[in-house]
Amino acid sequence: MQKVFLTGITGYIGQHCAAELLRQGYEVVGAIRSRSKADETRSAISRVASIKKLSFVEVDLLSDKGWKEAMEGSTYVLHVASPFLLKEPKDESELITPAVEGTKRVIAAAQFAGVKRLVLTSSTFAIIAGKETGRYGPTDWSDTDADIGAYAKSKTLAERAAWEAANGGNMEMTVINPGAVFGPSLGAELDGQSVTMMNKLITGKIPMIPDMAMGMVDVRDVAKLHVAAITASGAAGKRFIACTAEPVSMATVAQVLREAGYKKAPSMKAPTFLLKFMSKFDPEAKGMLPFIGRKASYENSATFDVLNWKPTPMATSFREMAASISK
C-alpha cells in the first residue's frame, strides 16, 4: 500500500483530493495545523469515501517543526495547501510569505524523506495575471511586476520557488494549474475563494455581475488530475492547465443559478467604472480589478493527453456547488 502525504486536507480542494486518493486505495496522511480540525475533516471526507486508511499529523507551514518526521515512509506528496483571502490584503506579504515559505518547507521535507514525486497545486493565476486577452499555455507565466493583486502574485512566486527548490534533486515534481474551481463542497465551512463567491451569488450578496470570464473546472476533476499526476508517465517536470479552454463568464454562472431556482443570483451587469470607484474603499472590488474585461483562453491539450482528463460539464458544477452550500 503506497502512502501519500497531503497538505491542505482541511480545505475545499484538499478534501476532494483525500477522497479520491482513498477511493483509489492509497493510504493518506493529512497535514493539519490543529488536531481540533481532524474530526470535522474526517466526517466531511467520509461522506464520499472510506476513511479506514486516513490519518492526520499536526504540522504548521510556518514552522520547521515535525515536517521531516511527518513525511517518513511517504511515496508521494500532494502539496495542496495555500493561503487565500477573497479580499485584497493591506499588506501583500500576508499571502505571499506563507505561500512561498510553506512551499519551500514542504519540498525540503519531501526531498529529505525520499519522496518519489510531489504534485503541487498552483493556479492559472500563475500563468495569465498581468496579461492581456489572448491564448496561454503551460510555458507562460504571470507578470509579477504588474499590479496583479496579492493572490495571483503569491501563486506565481510560490510555484516559481517550488520549481527552483525541486530543480536538480532526485524527487520528481508535477504542477496542476487549476482555473476557477467549482463543484460541491464536502465540508460545512465555506472556505476557498470560489466557495465564498458562490455563497455570495446565491444569497444576493453580489448584487451585480462583474465583467469577468475565467477558465473553470470542477473540483472533483481537479482531485482526479492530482491523483493521476502522481503516477502518470510523461507528467514529471511539467505543468498541466486544469480548466476550460475558453473562458466562462460570471454572467453564465449567474444565469445557470437563476435557472436552477436561485432567485437572488444577480442579473444586472456591474459597470466597470463602478467597480473602479468601489475599489478605492472595498478590498473585494480591488481584488477583482486586475481581471475585469480580460478573457484569457488556454492550451490545455496536455491535460487531456497525459492525465486522461474527462471534464465535468460546468453547469453541473455550478448547480451541485450551490446545492451543497445551501443545505
Give, region by region, the residue ranges found by the protein language model.
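Glycine/proline-rich active-site loop of Rossmann-fold NAD(P)-dependent oxidoreductases
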Residues: G168-M171, G183-T196, A229-F240
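Conserved Rossmann-fold NAD(P)-dependent oxidoreductase catalytic core, especially the SDR/UDP-sugar
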Residues: H79, P83, P89-G149
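Mid/C-terminal beta-alpha module of Rossmann-like enzyme folds, strongest
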Residues: A213, L225-K286, D305, M314-K327
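N-terminal Rossmann NAD(P)H-binding glycine-rich loop of SDR-like oxidoreductase domains
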Residues: V4-Y26
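Active-site Tyr-X1-5-Lys
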Residues: A146-M173
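NAD(P)H-binding glycine-rich loop region in Rossmannoid oxidoreductase-like domains
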Residues: S36-E40, S46-E101
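A conserved pocket-lining segment of Rossmann-fold NAD(P)-dependent short-chain dehydrogenase/reductase
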Residues: E88, T144-D147, V181, A188, ...
